[in-house]
Amino acid sequence: MAKVMIVGAGGVGSVVAHKCAALEDFTDILLASRTVAKCDQIAAHIGSPKVKTAALDAFQVSDTVKLLQDFGADLLINVALPYQDLVLMDACLEAGVDYLDTANYEPPDVAKFEYSWQWAYQDKFKDAGLMALLGCGFDPGVTGVFTAYALKHHFDEIHYLDIVDCNAGNHGQAFATNFNPEINIREITQKGRYHEDGVWQEIDPLSVHRDINYPHIGDRPSYLLYHEELESLVKNIPTLKRARFWMTFSEAYINHLRVLEAVGMTRIDEVEYQGQKIVPLQFLKAVLPEPASLAENYSGQTSIGCYIKGVKDGQAKTYYIYNNCDHAVCFAEVGSQAISYTTGVPAALGGLMMVQGKWKQAGVFNVEEMDPDPFLAKLGEMGLPWHEVVNGPFPFDD
């Protein structure tokens, strides 16, 4: 039995709260955000006496520590902004609480995300006897668990990994992002990167693409970009010769993005407007649709998986493991779209693994360092069934 504090009341925070409320292991849930009205709305939708709400500015470490201590939290699940990862980790250390997040740290003034800042907390968490589990959404998150499962059950060595992420849904908007617009646009407008033969290769943003066939969806144009799980996977699976990440974008989305970039609306530095300092990308976020608002009219599916190639018993082997998720089904269950759902469910499940002691070690860890079996045994029951194709077509032999 455990108490969990969830920080963040966006689309993902809502899913995490719904899923935690449905789990017997979580006896008390505190949903905290700068805008407490959002927390109250989510709590009302869940309708469980287990869920309480609170206002919190997560940048204020002392406020977070007090809230954690007053609540008696065993675990903090961070689904707020990546800018807040380090201050929330600091608060957990001070309050003596385990930590879980879904995205690695990113400094507000530089569009650059990497694990080094959080990995540097290893000794602090280990010495405190606390655990910090990093990147426990879907990608990063389930993709790392998928890869660990493949290594445990199907391969002696993994040589090639291509993570593929398709959203074939339709939300009816001319242009909108499926999660925080500021974070989303920063991610895809920076240089693409992939790891090959021990070296990081860099490409211009969205300059490499190919059609990839996704189950029950078909061919979709997929763009090579940098995604954070590549950094931890090449560290934790040193036999990898190449690791890449692909994501689908429609032509209309790319065109909108390029126009916004060309006119300066994706800038993250301050500009002066009518005597005030504003950041263009933050202003753009304010005028774009709130991602959670897309859920009601969303149709279609997502498909996220890992194409893996390596060696088992001296023989070459290919393996594909994936999940498809339906936007409308997610909305019917918890009132969210599938992007939020596929991130929030693994976060709640990762928290469950921690409080049950199945994933429990002192220090800072990525999900692929944990035993994948208990997590994947529960993932389908939690709403994200997964599928395998052994020695099927491998579309990346080029």
UniProtKB/Swiss-Prot annotation:
Effect upon mutating F113W: 10-fold decrease in catalytic efficiency
Catalytic reaction(s) noted: N(1)-[(S)-3-amino-3-carboxypropyl]agmatine + NADP(+) + H2O = L-aspartate 4-semialdehyde + agmatine + NADPH + H(+)
Enzyme class, broadest EC rank: oxidoreductase
Origin superkingdom: Bacteria
Disruption phenotype annotation: Deletion of the gene leads to substantial accumulation of agmatine and lack of CAPA, aminopropylagmatine (APA) and spermidine. However, the knockout mutant shows a remarkable decrease in putrescine concentration compared with the wild-type strain.
Pathway per the UniProt entry: Amine and polyamine biosynthesis; spermidine biosynthesis
Keywords, sorted A to Z: NADP, Oxidoreductase, Spermidine biosynthesis
Family: Belongs to the saccharopine dehydrogenase family.
Task performed by this protein: Dehydrogenase involved in the biosynthesis of spermidine via the carboxyaminopropylagmatine (CAPA) pathway. Catalyzes the reductive condensation of agmatine and L-aspartate-beta-semialdehyde (ASA) into CAPA. Shows activity toward putrescine and 1,3-diaminopropane, but the catalytic efficiency is three to four orders of magnitude lower than that for agmatine. Cannot use cadaverine or spermidine.
Protein name: Carboxyaminopropylagmatine dehydrogenase
